[in-house]
A protein has these predicted regions:
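TPR/TPR-like (Sel1-like) alpha-helical repeat modules
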Residues: 1, 7-14, 20-35, 269-285
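Tandem amphipathic alpha-helical repeat scaffolds
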Residues: 7-15, 45-59, 88-103, 129-143, ...
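C-terminal structural cap/anchor segments
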Residues: 223-297
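Helix-turn-helix repeat elements of alpha-solenoid scaffolds
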Residues: 17-27, 57-74, 101-116, 142-155, ...
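Alpha-solenoid helical repeat architecture
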Residues: 2, 39-46, 78-89, 121-132, ...
Length: 364
């Protein structure tokens, strides 16, 4: 609008021969045009980057380099232009860049800086934008094992979304994961009930509904006494082929592991051995050792159950070196081949050993 008005007035004063006024609006038109070009360039960089990040969980070195370059360019553009939109694009490009490199500490810091910037420009306030930032901060806290601040951001994010909306369910999904990773299983159960008990839950996609079924399985595994009154068909879960069978990363391995955990609890040695071997073969075919470090290590730990004939002490001793490696690795950025850890593998392993020990000499 500024450019259009400046051009019209420039033309008007040129026709009248008023040089001073002509120059005034000519300068304004030049400044406006420069700003538009800067904003257009920043929009292009952000949208091009977003299109690549949104459709993939695995980021190439080329994309990493591009994201870094765009972040630096947007910084230079915003440095000399007093434009809310341009500064906002710079922050958004930066958040995408840190997402690509998987640095959640830097992402969290940039989110905090963005919130300060938005408070200074409150006239442009959007509830959805504030909810988006709070959600992103909660996810960062999940990967940084910061339950206290994660919970605070989760509660904050929920204020900005209508109950039953897609974004509301997204917040609850991440909130559930945060609680499970912090060992707050009772709270996780409350979040689960809040989501699945909502009247809009039935309208979620099949994929999203199944994700909540998987969450329920893990919740039932860690809280069998609390959930035994609920209808959860363990045998059906063990035997059914899920929607995610075509997804060779992400949630499908999490399903296979959950099924195996229930078999271990039931003491079904034959099926345990068969399924651990199937999981090993699956891992060698579809899970990259470099990109799925924690899952690959955990599968090796599970194999010690067979190798040590389900003897708790022997299993614990044989798996100890792998547990050390697992503890030293970090749960973080999910690549396209990484498994979603609904419960940290270290916690699952502790439960397995504890329940095996309670059976005294195992199943022999």
């Amino acid at each position: 609008i500024t450019l259009l008005c400046a051009r019209m007035l420039r033309h008007h004063y040129s026709m009248m021969g008023l040089k001073q006024e002509f120059q005034q609006f000519n300068d304004l038109a030049d400044v406006s045009l420069k700003l538009i070009r800067s904003e257009t360039k920043a929009e292009h960089m952000y949208e091009q980057l977003l299109s690549q990040v949104a459709r993939s969980k695995s980021y190439s070195q080329e994309l990493t380099a591009t994201a870094k370059e765009y972040f630096n360019q947007s910084k230079e553009l915003s440095k000399y232009q007093q434009s809310f939109h341009l500064h906002l694009l710079h922050y958004r490009i930066g958040l995408l860049y840190y997402q690509v490199i998987g640095n959640y500490r830097l992402t969290l810091n940039l989110c905090n800086r963005l919130q300060v910037f938005l408070k200074k420009n409150s006239r442009y306030r959007l509830a959805s934008r504030e909810g988006e930032i709070a959600l992103l901060k909660m996810v960062c806290c999940l990967y940084l094992n910061d339950y206290k601040n994660g919970k605070q951001n989760a509660d904050e994010a929920l204020k900005f979304y209508t109950q039953g909306s897609n974004n509301w369910f997204v917040v609850l999904q991440n909130y559930f994961m945060l609680a499970m990773h912090a060992g707050k299983h009772k709270q996780a159960a409350e979040i689960f009930e809040q989501a699945t008990g909502h009247q809009r839950f039935q309208y979620l996609s099949d994929e999203k509904s199944e994700e909540w079924k998987i969450y329920e399985a893990y919740l039932h595994y860690v809280m069998p006494a609390k959930t035994k009154g609920k209808e959860f068909k363990i045998l059906k879960f063990i035997n059914e082929v899920p929607i995610y069978s075509k997804d060779k990363g992400g949630l499908y391995p999490a399903i296979l592991i959950a099924q195996l955990l229930f078999m271990i609890d039931r003491g079904d040695e034959d099926r345990i051995e068969k399924n651990i071997e199937s999981l090993r073969i699956f891992s060698s075919r579809y899970l990259s050792g470099k990109k799925s470090v924690r899952t690959s290590i955990f599968i090796k730990m599970l194999r010690q159950l067979i190798n040590c004939h389900f003897k708790p002490e022997k299993v614990k001793a044989k798996a100890a070196p792998y547990l050390k490696k697992l503890t030293e690795s970090k749960y973080g950025h999910l690549t396209e081949n990484e498994t979603m850890e609904i419960i940290p593998y270290e916690d699952i392993w502790s439960i397995i050993l504890s329940r095996m020990t309670s059976k005294k000499q195992g199943w022999n």
